[in-house]
Amino acid sequence: MSGTGKDKAGYLVGFIVFICVIPFFMFLLAGRIDPGAGRMICCIVLAAAGIGLSVWSIVYMKRVGQGNPLDAFDHEIGPRTKRLMTDGPYRICRNPMLLGVFIFYAGLQILLLSWKALLLFAAFVLIMLYQVKMEEQRLERDFGREYLEYKKKTPALLPDLNSFKKH
């Protein structure tokens, strides 16, 4: 598959899995939902913020990192980044795209209030934390000392709120 084909395939797989399939199963597991206006507003705000952060991260990765976000368990589905990204959304945490997805799912969970959907969300979080660990090993191999310095000063997933004061 050509670079452009791999790129498109990576985006398509990511969209289908993270924005369609997992939320579909969260809703399926939740069964009947009857949210009030407050929960609906909270869900919409969190979902929009999460998707916004993820999209910003993807666009930044394409433009600055010159790569594609889909590299699953050390298998290259889309072209890997050629440059280490340490600015933009990547200055607040090393995995802003994943943080955005977690925020999106948290919004859905507030809407659904389902322990079954919460278990799916928790399983997804555990799988993705394992993926992050594998990805960080690859980034250390690919970018060496530069990545280790970035890793030392930037949190993996949960932003240090004090870092916003510095920027």
Name every feature range the model reports, one short phrase each.
Residues 1-87, 99-167:
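Membrane-anchoring alpha-helices and their flanking helix-loop junctions
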Residues 92-99:
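Histidine-centered phosphotransfer motif of kinases
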